Amino acid sequence: MNNGYLYIITNEAFPEWVKVGTTTNLISRLHTYQTGDPFRRYRIVYSLQHPEFREAEKRIKETMKHFALEIKGEWYKIDLHMAKSRLEEQLDEYNNALPQQEKVKISCLMA
């Protein structure tokens, strides 16, 4: 198992769009975005730990592809709450295959 994070980033300059991605370090990931924006408007508004975060991201992207800015993009024109629920659904699906004592709890950050 590779523990990492699924996250949602927003930027007030693009209020209807969210970015969904993965990382093993939320702070350094946010800093890479901030260097491209002189106003530092990117915010991680939601994240959760997931033992199989890269595979979960692939499934999320598949379910959200019709909201994407471009085919291989990570920016989606989708309501923040809907995007958040897509991340949580992936953790629920992962947990459904585990015995009760091994289930992963949602541990998240919200802005």
Feature-to-residue mapping (PLM):
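Non-catalytic accessory segments flanking enzymatic or RNA/DNA-binding domains
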Residues: 1-111
